[in-house]
């Protein structure tokens, strides 16, 4: 869902994958969250620049709440990578890790189980719930 550039659509078509692509355009936030919970795999792509290592997109927290596996791509050794590895919520790859990404996708679909993929990591993921993050921030401010 959302805006997809024509360049990306053309690249998907050129790779012979156009028949697997459904461009939904913009949807409501509630609909986006529903789609996330229904997904077999969630894709999070960060800008490939060292400056983004310390930037955590809000989408990551929505993805964690969706309890679906996350395939993230971005610069190595950043905060997003740390969170994904700590929560075991998926896998993080640097740009150019094509074979490793392919293997992760294939393994994810082979072991796909909508009901319990991330349930075993729920405690780690719960640390990043908005309520818990707000509580931690309030404690920091008070002290």
Feature map (PLM): residue ranges:
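Nucleotide-activated donor-binding/catalytic signature segment of Leloir-type glycosyltransferases, i.e.
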Residues: 2, 6-33
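Acidic donor-binding loop of glycosyltransferase active sites
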Residues: 20, 36-53
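Short acidic alpha-helix that forms the nucleotide-activated donor recognition element
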Residues: 28-39, 65
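Short alpha-helical segment that forms part of, or immediately flanks, the ligand-binding pocket
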Residues: 33, 58-66, 81-82
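Short hydrophobic beta-strand element within catalytic cores of glycosyltransferases
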Residues: 41-44, 62-74
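A charged, aromatic-enriched C-terminal amphipathic alpha-helix characteristic of glycosyltransferases
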Residues: 96-100, 113-142
């Amino acid at each position: 869902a959302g805006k997809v550039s024509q360049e990306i659509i053309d690249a998907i078509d050129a790779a012979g994958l156009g028949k697997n692509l459904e461009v939904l355009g913009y949807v409501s936030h509630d609909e986006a969250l529903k789609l996330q919970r229904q997904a077999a795999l969630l894709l999070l792509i960060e800008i490939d620049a060292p400056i983004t290592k310390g930037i955590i997109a809000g989408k990551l927290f929505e993805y964690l709440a969706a309890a679906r596996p996350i395939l993230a791509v971005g610069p190595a050794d950043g905060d997003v990578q740390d969170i994904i590895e700590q929560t075991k919520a998926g896998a993080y790859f640097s740009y150019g890790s094509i074979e490793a990404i392919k293997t992760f996708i294939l393994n994810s679909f082979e072991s796909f189980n909508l009901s319990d993929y991330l349930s075993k990591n729920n405690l780690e993921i719960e640390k990043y719930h908005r309520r818990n993050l707000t509580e931690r921030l309030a404690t920091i401010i008070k002290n």
